[in-house]
Swiss-Prot record:
This is Casparian strip membrane protein 3. Keywords: Cell membrane, Cell wall biogenesis/degradation, Membrane, Transmembrane, Transmembrane helix. Regulates membrane-cell wall junctions and localized cell wall deposition. Required for establishment of the Casparian strip membrane domain (CSD) and the subsequent formation of Casparian strips, a cell wall modification of the root endodermis that determines an apoplastic barrier between the intraorganismal apoplasm and the extraorganismal apoplasm and prevents lateral diffusion. It comes from Ricinus communis. Signal peptide: none annotated. NCBIfam families: A_tha_TIGR01569. It comes from the Eukaryota. Residues 1-26 are annotated as: Disordered. Belongs to the Casparian strip membrane proteins (CASP) family. GO terms for biological process: cell wall modification; cell-cell junction assembly. The chain crosses the membrane at residues 56-76, 102-122, 137-157, 190-210. Residues 77-101, 158-189 are extracellular.
Length: 215
């Protein structure tokens, strides 16, 4: 019996009795009984059941990554501080676009957030069609590219934030966070949010690769 069939019925018809040896038939013999035997259906668990659960989890993680990516972009993009004192020639002002590294950070995390938003329809397709291979393969490829971009931007910004906090005596770079405390706190928060986004992208890559595994 095939396990994928919903059920089958077996009909058994008894053979009529043979005629009397003397040549006389049995006139009053009842019609042959019909015996119907029904086999119980054996339902097979859907192959894509666990993959659908993975796809739903993928969708939720993407929403969280969008939130952290937008937070990193917004916090860094609005980072600015002006000290309440100034001299005749200088005004002490710090803004994210004073450093090309922070500008690259905003650009990269903005791209990552935009990509994650555009990837949501593909994630929904994976929920509707959990056995589809092409959408998951595309997600793995683009997730990897965006993850690399996000890690590069976060790492570069983290190096600048470290110098802002600690300085570098060999290069005569003084720490500025004692004066620009709010500026340093905002940039540090943005870098942490960006690293969280990169970690979620890494997890999404592993999740998609696991979902491509065949039963």
């Amino acid at each position: 019996m095939d396990s994928e069939k919903t059920g089958e019925a077996k009909i058994t018809i008894q053979e009529p009795k043979a005629a009397d040896p003397k040549g006389k038939g049995i006139a009053d013999a009842p019609p042959p009984p019909v015996v119907v035997t029904t086999a119980k259906a054996i339902q097979k668990l859907p192959r894509g059941g666990w993959k659908k659960g993975v796809a739903i989890f993928d969708f939720v993680v993407r929403l969280c990554a969008i939130a952290t990516g937008l937070a990193a972009t917004g916090i860094m993009g609005t980072t600015e501080q002006t000290l309440p004192f100034f001299t005749q020639f200088f005004q002490f002002h710090a803004e994210y676009n004073d450093l090309p590294t922070f500008m690259f950070f905003v650009f990269a995390n903005g791209i990552a957030s935009g990509y994650l938003i555009l990837s949501l329809p593909f994630s929904i397709v994976c929920i509707v069609r959990p056995l589809a291979i092409v959408p998951r393969l595309l997600l793995i490829i683009f997730d990897t590219v965006v993850m690399a971009l996000t890690i590069a931007a976060a790492s570069a910004a983290a190096a600048i934030v470290y110098l802002a906090h600690n300085g570098n005596s060999n290069a005569n770079w003084n720490a500025i966070c004692q004066q620009f405390n709010d500026f340093c706190q905002q940039t540090s928060t943005a870098v942490v949010a960006s690293f969280i986004t990169a970690a979620m992208l890494t997890f999404l890559i592993v999740l998609s690769a696991f979902a491509l595994k065949r039963n």
